[in-house]
């Protein structure tokens, strides 16, 4: 699986992917978040990456250099050159087959290649599948945090050389 930087023509497919995942009801995603403005901003900033296979957009991930959580006293231990991994999303039709682990590894490899030394992320507290994905991949649970009107679990992981 190779993540490539998204381009403006990817925006409709990314938004459709987000909506398909939102319908699963395992997170706070809905018709208002993530929205077209967020997708356009991520593409403009060069922080949105996608995975396509046979022309179909199957996954997306955003790697931010900074996010609000970096300024919050959440108890991160790995604070040297972190990125914030957000909006990690795999097509519902591809879930449950180990591809989520591959997507997470691809996002970590990309972050490492971009010079980041740690990953910080928020996981909706209701999303037990994502919680298992992150803990299974070696992410350290930091805390629970009520942010943006929702309850999140905060995770982090240092990025080591492969």
Could you describe each region identified by the protein language model?
Residues 2-16:
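A short beta-loop-alpha structural element at the N-terminal edge
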Residues 8, 21-28, 32-87, 91-93, ...:
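Acetyl-CoA-dependent GNAT
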Residues 9, 13, 34, 57, ...:
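Short alpha-helical
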Residues 90, 96-109, 132-136:
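Conserved acetyl-CoA-binding loop-helix of GNAT-fold acetyltransferases
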Residues 95, 121-131, 147-151:
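Conserved beta-strand-loop-alpha-helix junction that forms the acyl-donor binding cleft
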Residues 104, 111-123:
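Conserved GNAT acetyl-CoA-binding A-motif
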Residues 135-144:
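Conserved acetyl-CoA-binding loop of GNAT-fold acetyltransferases
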């Amino acid at each position: 699986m190779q993540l490539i930087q998204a381009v403006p023509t990817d925006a409709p497919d990314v938004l459709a992917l987000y909506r398909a995942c939102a319908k699963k009801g395992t997170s706070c995603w809905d018709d208002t978040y993530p929205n077209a403005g967020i997708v356009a901003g991520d593409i403009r900033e060069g922080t949105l990456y996608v995975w396509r296979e046979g022309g179909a957009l199957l996954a997306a991930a955003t790697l931010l250099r900074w996010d609000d959580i970096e300024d919050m006293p959440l108890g991160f231990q790995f604070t040297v050159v972190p990125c914030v991994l957000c909006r990690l999303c795999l097509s519902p039709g591809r879930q449950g087959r180990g591809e989520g682990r591959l997507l997470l590894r691809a996002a970590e490899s990309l972050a490492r290649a971009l010079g980041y030394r740690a990953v910080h992320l928020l996981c909706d507290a209701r999303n037990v599948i994502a919680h298992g994905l992150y803990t299974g991949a070696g992410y350290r649970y930091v805390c629970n945090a009520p942010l943006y009107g929702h309850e999140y679990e905060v995770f982090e992981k240092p990025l080591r050389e492969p």
